[in-house]
Regions:
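N-terminal leader/signal peptides at the extreme start of proteins
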Residues: 1-17
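N-terminal single-pass transmembrane signal-anchor helix
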Residues: 12-40
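Membrane-proximal amphipathic alpha-helices
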Residues: 41, 45-56
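Alpha-helix exit/C-cap motif
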Residues: 46-50, 61-79
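Generic recognition of well-ordered alpha-helical segments
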Residues: 54, 58-61, 130
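Extracellular/periplasmic head regions of type IV pilus-like filament subunits
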Residues: 69-133, 151-152
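Short, low-complexity, Pro/Ser/Thr/Gly-rich segments in the mature regions of secreted, periplasmic
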Residues: 144-152
Length: 152
C-alpha cells in the first residue's frame, strides 16, 4: 500500500464505498422497490385476468358451435371445453368449468374459479352465460370491485 501523507482523499478513493454511501444506495433501492413491486404485481394480475377472459369467450364460442351441432348445450358426448384452465400453458391461475341447468339444455354457464397465485385476487371468479353476459360470481370479489371494472 502506498502512503499518501499529503493527499489522503486520493488514497481513500481507491478503497471502495463508505458505509454511508452503501446505506443511501440501499435506502434508494428499497424506496424504488416499494413503489414498483405493487404496480408490477397488479399488472401481472391484470394480464392473468385478460387470459381468463379470452379463454372464457373462446369456450363460449365453442359452446355455441356445440349447440349448433347438437341442438342443446348438453348431450352425448358432453361438451369438452377446449380451454379448461387459464393461462393455457404454465401455472394454473383459473380453472374453467361449464354447467348446464337440469331441464334447460338451451342454456349454459361458464365459470372461471381462481386458483394458485390468483386465489386471493380481488376481482373474484368470472362467469359467462349462453347470452354472453359477463359477470362475477357473487361473494367472491372485493367490495370495491364490480363486473365493469374487472371485465375490461
Amino acid at each position: 500500500m502506498r502512503a499518501c501523507p499529503f493527499r489522503p482523499a486520493a488514497c481513500r478513493a481507491g478503497r471502495g464505498f463508505t458505509l454511508v454511501e452503501l446505506l443511501v444506495a440501499a435506502t434508494a433501492l428499497a424506496i424504488l422497490a416499494a413503489i414498483a413491486l405493487p404496480a408490477f404485481f397488479e399488472q401481472l394480475a391484470r394480464a392473468r385476468r385478460t387470459d381468463v377472459q379470452a379463454a372464457l369467450l373462446e369456450d363460449a364460442g365453442y359452446m355455441q358451435h356445440y349447440y349448433a351441432s347438437h341442438d342443446a348445450f348438453s348431450g352425448t358426448p358432453p361438451p369438452q371445453l377446449p380451454f379448461a384452465q387459464a393461462p393455457r400453458q404454465g401455472g394454473v391461475a383459473y380453472v374453467i368449468t361449464v354447467a348446464v341447468p337440469p331441464g334447460d339444455p338451451s342454456s349454459f354457464l361458464l365459470t372461471a374459479t381462481r386458483a394458485g397465485g390468483m386465489a386471493r385476487d380481488p376481482c373474484g371468479d368470472f362467469t359467462v352465460d349462453h347470452l354472453g353476459r359477463r359477470e362475477l360470481v357473487p361473494g367472491t370479489f372485493a367490495p370495491d370491485r364490480d363486473a365493469a371494472r374487472c371485465w375490461r
